Amino acid sequence: IEARKKALGKILAIHNKSCLYCMRSTSCELQNLLHEYGFTNEQELPKENLEALDTTSKVLVRDNNKCIRCKRCINICAKAQAVSAISATGEGLETVITPASPKGLAASSCVNCGQCVAVCPTGALTEIDQTEEVKKALADPDKYVVVQVAPAVRAALGEDFEFPIGVDVEGRI
């Protein structure tokens, strides 16, 4: 138990603690583990050396300040899409998770399937939230709003209903 607490303390020391504003706030594995092992707010350390967000993609945002280096995103990217758009350098707490392209996710082989977002336990990878833009468009009487379901959604939606990764559920939506 002490080894786990020590490891969690090291992860917490390098973690961006913007939990209140994080999309994973109520479903964060790191928060759950910290609570389970008795960490309190007083043990949080100040934010230092924050990395810039990777906003190069039109669909995803990557925040390495929240990354706990679990490599789930790397594994699912290689397994689900076989594109390996995300990679890692270094070992242990020195590991850095990065897009395969140094120019960011948009320049990598990423196909915007969202699998990495689904497996990220801390919100280091999130979808760009366009809810407000959609609400404005729906409320505008001068606009015709058309809904289109992207191919990635047709495949990813099936996983919520326990279909194998990549099964197209078009016609079942």
Annotate the PLM regions:
Residues 1-2, 127-173:
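Iron-sulfur-associated redox domains of electron-transfer enzymes in respiratory
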Residues 1-112, 118, 125-137, 144:
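Fe-S ferredoxin-like electron-transfer domains
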